[in-house]
Amino acid sequence: MGNHLSVNKLKRKKKKKSFLNIYGKNTNENTSKQSNDYKYDINTSCISREGTTTLERKNLILCHSGKLEDKYIIDEKLGQGTYGCVYKGIDKVTNQLYAIKEEKKDRLKNINRFFQEIEIMKKLDHPNIVKLYETYENDNYIYLIMELCSGRELFDSIIENGSFTEKNAATIMKQIFSAIFYLHSLNIVHRDLKPENFLFQSENKDSLLKIIDFGLSKNLGTGEFTTTKAGTPYYVAPQVLDGKYDKKCDIWSSGVIMYTLLCGYPPFYGDTDNEVLKKVKKGEFCFYENDWGSISSDAKNLITKLLTYNPNERCTIEEALNHPWITQMTKSHEHVELSSTLLKNLKNFKKENELKKIALTIIAKHLCDVEINNLRNIFIALDVDNSGTLSSQEILDGLKKIGYQKIPPDIHQVLRDIDSNASGQIHYTDFLAATIDKQTYLKKEVCLIPFKFFDIDGNGKISVEELKRIFGRDDIENPLIDKAIDSLLQEVDLNGDGEIDFHEFMLMMSKKK
């Protein structure tokens, strides 16, 4: 089977180019129409840990009921999905660019599932997963404000290239495996991994790959099974078609993607969806000599392990990440120079007040790829187990590599303080927030991003009520939160008016501990 013929088959299967493929296109889900009066309620409760107030990551993503147009300029359309469109959005104050996903409520088959997608996205923080920043909702529409990826779909790269070199394919697959590892560690199964659901962050040749759609994702614990037939014919696992499967369906899908990257066509193909599904159900595939003769035995071995029919015998995601093909082919990408200021920034972060820590976290989440490129590479290099999070030991080992033989005795407390949700692991954005240099964040246009987040009513000042909403809930009394806010105002509210204006906010951000 030749590449040119196979690529043409893929082209015919590509129905529409869209930035986000909305769930429901290829599923047999039992759905029902929901009423339009469902209102999404964000839970902004805080966590108390060791006498401090900390925020769950999902609480940095607020749901607004105001007019989207008051904050964003709606620019060009980026794509069309089944139930809505995706536009480029421009923040009127900061000029930051975003992708705005618009969903019309009366066209959603199951609005509760859509809110489940939002809840899942709010938990996620990984270099290879698109970021969700905030949501808007009115009577007719729901809007997701997301990270803008200016690169192309992985699908389009396959169409253009026909196939990838093993080195390039391994670089892509390592990112996909890492994202799957992270999702599964959170007990989330994706269920629709396919090249159309991956975007390159930019047009740069070394750009990160991002999963951009979570419409079919669901929470699924270890040892649990689900029965809904969901996915896309080429990439769906046989067990999904049988109606009983677990998280290993994602590993099968990754095997289909890897096969396609290396030869330009999927292992199970046909002129109709039914033909494809029949072949998937059998699970039999071949490495055709014309296309696979020059491909290494290691690559074919990994594909065979990923596409093992019996899920109990299929390789785990950890085994995929540690497979010789991945470790050998991506070795050159792992040498990153660690800055000697890394430990200094980590220690300084511990001393900051809670408002500044949250502000730095918001900044870290919003900064573009160019601004965090070095820190991102450091994070990936330190993440030895490719889990998408950092353990204390991984950071300590990294510090020793750059010559820190005498690690400060309080280092474990420093690292615990960075762990914003007490998970025992340091997440991507937490690491960026704790290590970002002042010269990067101490700019008016950058500091406006967190200030506007705190200034919910947009009057140019951060009030006590707004701080309560950020740190906890403004409708529930909490002495711990009240005490934290009083202490914060004493430090930051220099003119004593009970509010924090932007000048006071900038002074707080520039203050050296």
UniProtKB/Swiss-Prot annotation:
Ca(2+) 3 binds at D493, N495, D497, E499, E504. Myristoylated; myristoylation may target it to different subcellular compartments. The keyword Lipoprotein applies. ATP binds at L78, G79, Q80, G81, T82, Y83, G84, C85, V86, K101. Ca(2+) 1 binds at D383, D385, S387, T389, E394. The active site is at D192 (proton acceptor). Residues 370-405, 406-441, 442-477, 480-513 form the EF-hand domain. Keywords: ATP-binding, Calcium, Kinase, Lipoprotein, Magnesium, Metal-binding, Myristate, Nucleotide-binding, Phosphoprotein, Repeat, Serine/threonine-protein kinase, Transferase. Its EC number is 2.7.11.1. Its cofactor is Mg(2+). A motif (J domain autoinhibitory motif) lies at residues 345-353. Monomer. Calcium-dependent protein kinase which acts as a sensor and effector of intracellular Ca(2+) levels probably in part downstream of cGMP-activated PKG kinase. During male gametogenesis in the mosquito gut, required for male exflagellation, possibly by regulating male gamete exit from the host erythrocytes. Not required for asexual blood stage proliferation. This is Calcium-dependent protein kinase 2. It comes from Plasmodium falciparum (isolate K1 / Thailand). The gene is CDPK2.
